[in-house]
Amino acid sequence: MGAASRRDCDLAGNSTKIRGSKSLRKGRVSIKGQPYLITSTIHEREDLLNDAQSSGIVAGALHWLHENNRIDLIAYVIMPDHIHFIATLKSGTLPEIMHSLKSYTSKKINKTLKREGGVWQEQYHDHAIRKEEDLKEVIHYCLNNPVRKKLVKSYQDYPYWYCKWEV
């Protein structure tokens, strides 16, 4: 690995760069028709998505991507500081989809909340879902996130979720 730039070092000059993150992004594969679980986190884990307006912006953008044949949206949950969504790619690559989603929602959320600055962390996590049985488990994992965080007793009580199938 090459020398870290000054901005990638702490005060003592030690590298703070996450090793391998660039190579992981480089090796990212986008397969049309492949279901993915995608997780994206708000910058500095700030609770920007804890209201109907901000969550509605993200939900609206996900549904727009679905309605415009960019993704087949299967499920999502919008947590106060991150989102999980499950979708299959229809057109474009995963990085293109994520760029569209983050760029649009950042501008709208900043305008709505009358704020400036970053909304999303640059990175996101994607996991290709291999089998149909796994897909059901991943949907349950995704939708039950608010339950695990003790925000609600049942995911149906949480206001910011969607699933195209009955679970």
Describe the function of each predicted region.
Residues 1-167:
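Short catalytic/metal-binding and nucleic-acid-binding patches
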